[in-house]
């Protein structure tokens, strides 16, 4: 029960091909590949387009002053 032999994996592969068919498996592979590529491109774009978080916070509060009064609880 520890490891699976090559025969086990071949039977599993055969069952998957019979259940889904080769065309459906090809479509799933294509969709998965395009999703991974899109994720990698998005991560690359996000890394180059954004500034560090400290700089963003300082820029947004440096331009404006906020004056707030608090009400005592009573």
Curated annotation (Swiss-Prot):
Q: What does this protein do?
A: Part of the twin-arginine translocation (Tat) system that transports large folded proteins containing a characteristic twin-arginine motif in their signal peptide across membranes. TatA could form the protein-conducting channel of the Tat system.
Topologically, how does it sit relative to the membrane?
A: Single-pass membrane protein
* UniProt key word Acyltransferase: no
Could you cite one Gene Ontology molecular function of this protein?
Answer: protein transmembrane transporter activity
Q: Name one GO biological process term.
A: protein transport by the Tat complex
* Entry keyword set: Cell inner membrane, Cell membrane, Membrane, Protein transport, Translocation, Transmembrane, Transmembrane helix, Transport
- Bias category Polar residues: which stretches? 56-68
The entry describes its oligomerization and partners as:
The Tat system comprises two distinct complexes: a TatABC complex, containing multiple copies of TatA, TatB and TatC subunits, and a separate TatA complex, containing only TatA subunits. Substrates initially bind to the TatABC complex, which probably triggers association of the separate TatA complex to form the active translocon.
HAMAP family recorded: TatA_E
Which Gene3D superfamilies did the record assign?
Answer: 1.20.5.3310
- Cellular component per GO, a single term: TAT protein transport complex
Q: Where is this region: Disordered?
A: 50-74
Q: Transmembrane ranges?
A: 1-21
UniProt-recorded name of the protein: Sec-independent protein translocase protein TatA
Q: Where in the cell is it found?
A: Cell inner membrane
- Write out the similarity annotation: Belongs to the TatA/E family.
> Which InterPro entries does its entry note?
TatA/B/E (IPR003369), TatA/E (IPR006312)
């Amino acid at each position: 029960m520890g490891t699976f032999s090559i025969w086990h994996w071949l039977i599993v592969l055969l069952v998957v091909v019979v259940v889904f068919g080769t065309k459906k498996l090809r479509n799933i592979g294509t969709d998965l590949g395009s999703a991974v590529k899109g994720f990698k491109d998005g991560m690359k774009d996000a890394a180059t387009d954004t500034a560090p978080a400290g700089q963003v916070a300082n820029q947004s509060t440096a331009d404006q002053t906020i004056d707030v009064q608090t009400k005592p609880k009573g």
